[in-house]
Amino acid sequence: MSKGSAWGRPVTAPACMEVQIGAVRYRRDGALLLAASSLSSRTWGGSIWVFKDPEGAPNESLCTAGVQTEAGVTDVAWVSEKGILVASDSGAVELWEILEKESLLVNKFAKYEHDDIVKTLSVFSDGTQAVSGGKDFSVKVWDLSQKAVLKSYNAHSSEVNCVAACPGKDTIFLSCGEDGRILLWDTRKPKPATRIDFCASDTIPTSVTWHPEKDDTFACGDETGNVSLVNIKNPDSAQTSAVHSQNITGLAYSYHSSPFLASISEDCTVAVLDADFSEVFRDLSHRDFVTGVAWSPLDHSKFTTVGWDHKVLHHHLPSEGRTENLIATKAED
């Protein structure tokens, strides 16, 4: 049965951020959202943090707002301008709202609909619905205004690694799981899930993200470090590149008219592919798993990565006229 936390309870920022930073997201105005977790004794603790100036992260004293969560945080997403959706180790999906000139985070709900860790979530374009996936093999579609699950699916036979809502399509999303399957969902259909098979799909997919300009195309990362570009209408034509040597932990497209694709991995590296699927950037600065990546909406050449090494690194692509040169940089700590 679903249970909620204390509604409307304001919480002040904690004194210290956990060591392992697990997710990063930009708001449209450039504000940066971080999620952090750490293991204390036998339990995971977590927190979320907002930095109006991203250059201040992860310095706690420079945050705009922050809050301790009841368990570790696996994923976060902005909901419009004031909401923050949280995926929790506890099995809960939580919604927080930032108030009081953005100095205070207030809990709006916490719903324990998953029977295990919530690993991933994604918010649809209209900001009223979201999708989550968990270690309980389930995918759930949420009505955020009603604080309720609209639909729950069990099409995966193992834990769900990633979900991705389709930009501009409020009934379509992707999911991938440890069962090796990538599923295309359309919740309007009686049988909403369709399996997407392509030439490199004999490995376990770990991350998926939609191409921002093409609603029939998505990128996929897998456990071996491969990144693939897949057209839903012709999946056998997928392009695949061995970008990393270990598990892909995240993918993110830039805001360019011909968007770049950033990838991060457990091999502790960061890479960027251009529209021709050629590598134009690589960074080796992280000293542990890289776990989050997001592009700045204000400076399209800038993107940010975070990792279990507690680093928040801001990277800059070379000018578009020089992207044919492979760049290997060491970002500032």
Curated annotation (Swiss-Prot):
Tissue expression per record: Detected in egg (at protein level).
UniProt cross-references to PANTHER family, sorted A to Z: METHYLOSOME PROTEIN 50
First and last residues of every WD repeat: 16-59, 68-106, 113-152, 155-195, 199-240, 243-283, 285-328
GO cellular component, as recorded: cytosol; histone methyltransferase complex; methylosome
Subcellular localization: Cytoplasm; Nucleus
Name the UniProt record assigns to this protein: Methylosome protein WDR77
Pfam families: WD40
Keyword Repeat (UniProt): yes
Record text on subunit structure and interactions: Heterotetramer; dimer of heterodimer with prmt5. Interacts with histone h2a and h4 and with nucleoplasmin.
Function (record text): Non-catalytic component of the 20S prmt5-containing methyltransferase complex, which modifies specific arginines to dimethylarginines in several spliceosomal Sm proteins and histones. Required for normal prmt5 methyltransferase activity.
Highest taxon, organism lineage: Eukaryota
Single biological process term from Gene Ontology: oocyte axis specification
Alphabetized UniProt keyword annotations: Cytoplasm, Nucleus, Repeat, WD repeat
Alphabetized Gene3D superfamilies for the sequence: YVTN repeat-like/Quinoprotein amine dehydrogenase
UniProt cross-references to PROSITE patterns, sorted A to Z: WD_REPEATS_1, WD_REPEATS_2, WD_REPEATS_REGION
